[in-house]
Structures are given as structure tokens and as C-alpha cells.
Amino acid sequence: MPILMPSAEVPTIDISPLSGDDAKAKQRVAQEINKAARGSGFFYASNHGVDVQLLQDVVNEFHRNMSDQEKHDLAINAYNKDNPHVRNGYYKAIKGKKAVESFCYLNPSFSDDHPMIKSETPMHEVNLWPDEEKHPRFRPFCEDYYRQLLRLSTVIMRGYALALGRREDFFDEALAEADTLSSVSLIRYPYLEEYPPVKTGADGTKLSFEDHLDVSMITVLYQTEVQNLQVETVDGWQDIPRSDEDFLVNCGTYMGHITHDYFPAPNHRVKFINAERLSLPFFLNAGHNSVIEPFVPEGAAGTVKNPTTSYGEYLQHGLRALIVKNGQT
């Protein structure tokens, strides 16, 4: 069962000290992260150094210029049986059934000669891209953005590490750029005069995506100006405030697993709002063979109970379970 979070407060945390040399300032940020992670489970990361206006411009341009044929050619196996990809590719809207559409891409380091690609290890795919003559700035931007968000997320993880009583570089090795299974999803929610049927929560709220826990170490999300997210708390479902400038950060179930839910994955959902908007999550994942042994965080009670599992095994099982629960996105 998901953990009901004690608060709906979502603080904004200046993460820039985590990239500096001031140990006291780093510890201060770590304690702010600790409070947020054990409160609502969410915080906004400010002073992140990412050009979010350029991000919006490129993603809007991409969605605006994609033809139906291009979408089909790039569609994942669930929508196009000629494409073996199950992660990287286009996730199509289906008229009368499903309005949301998205493009997901993986680590640019995954090339044909990458050991995990050569061995056909699950969850690893060489990215397919739209025609670069028709979309000249899309691939270069996306590959650079991936590396920016990996660096940003690694810095944020140093704050989590300090908050857990570990060295600040505790997670660095598991997040090496050559092997990380992290992904970016460029999700578009359209405005439609006639919207397909949407699901309804137990409390009567219409939903674009039902309640779920993220399958990740952490999720680092940028979204445009429409408020739509809710977190499940001891007082029921509560709105998460929006931000036009900052990245929303929360733990995924792997952090919950290795910390024995000292830092739980907050249960959250997406309200249905008929408005044009973008949701752009970066799901931070370790490498396939990475193993982080569960531990009892500093200051927490209890003993180690959770089993050790490789990250690849965790991710494959978790993504399958999410599709079974909430359906194919």
C-alpha cells in the first residue's frame, strides 16, 4: 500500500550550494531535502541552470511539426508491431480513446557497439529519431538536454545522500553516464473540443492518469503552467502547486526500497484538465548492473529488511507492473 504523506507543502529549494565547496551550505540544503522528502515527498529545485524557455520552444515545435506518418513510424511496439522498441519511441494518441501523446528517449550513450546493446539486454535501446532534415534541432537539443538533466539529477542526489547520512558521492557510481537507464518523456496533453472518455478516481475526480508511484530513483519534472498534479496525504488528495521556472522533484520506489521508506515514493495522480500543456519528466535510473544495498538511514530506527536487487531487475519489473496497473501510456 502507498504511504500517505503527512503534508501537501511543496517547498522551493535552492540547490546551487550542492555544486559548491561550502560544506555547511550543502548540509543546509540536505536538511531541506530531508524535510520535503518526508513531508509531501515533493520539492521544487531552483537555480538549476536549465533554459526552460528553450525546452518549451523545442518540444512545442516538435509536437506541432510531427506528421501522423512520422508518429506511426516512430511508435513503440504497443502501437506499431514493426518496431521492436518498448521504451524509446512515440506513444500515440488514439482518436476517441486516448488524447495524450508523447515521445520517450533513452541514454544517447546507447549505440550499436555498447555492451548492453550488443548483448540485447532488456531496457536498453538505441534511440530512434525523427527525420533530422525536417526536425534539425530536435535531436541535438534532446541529447544535450539529457546530459544536462543527468548532471542536475546527480547533483540533487548528492543532497539526498547527505540527508541520509552518507557521503555526498554515495550515488555517483550508480549514475555513470555510460550506463544509466534514465529516460526523458516529452508528454503533450492537448486541448480538444471533444475529449475521449477519461477515468474517474474513487473520490469522483476526473483523471488524465491514475494514482501511481514513480518507477525511478528520483523524478525531475518540468511542466507548463496548468496545475494538474495531486499527492495523496493523510488528509486525502491535495493539489501540488505549479511553477513556471523550477523542476519538481520526488523519490521513486527504488529510493523507498533502499531506505526502507524513510524517503518514500509519494502516491500521486494527474487531474483531467482540458488544456494544452506539456509534462516533461526525467526519470533518473541507475545502470543495469548497479546494486545499492538497502540500509537504515542515519537517525532512523529499525533494521535492514528489504532484499538486494539489481537496478535492471527492479526497473524491468516496475515498468511492467505500472503498465498492468494503469495501462499503456
From Swiss-Prot:
2-oxoglutarate binds at R277. Residues 180-286 form the Fe2OG dioxygenase domain. Keywords: Antibiotic biosynthesis, Iron, Metal-binding, Oxidoreductase, Vitamin C. N-[(5S)-5-amino-5-carboxypentanoyl]-L-cysteinyl-D-valine binds at R87, Y91, S183, Y189, H212, D214, S279. Its cofactor is Fe cation; L-ascorbate. Isopenicillin N binds at R87, Y91, S183, Y189, S279. Pfam families: 2OG-FeII_Oxy, DIOX_N. SUPFAM superfamilies: Clavaminate synthase-like. The keyword Oxidoreductase applies. This is Isopenicillin N synthase. It comes from Streptomyces jumonjinensis. The gene is pcbC.
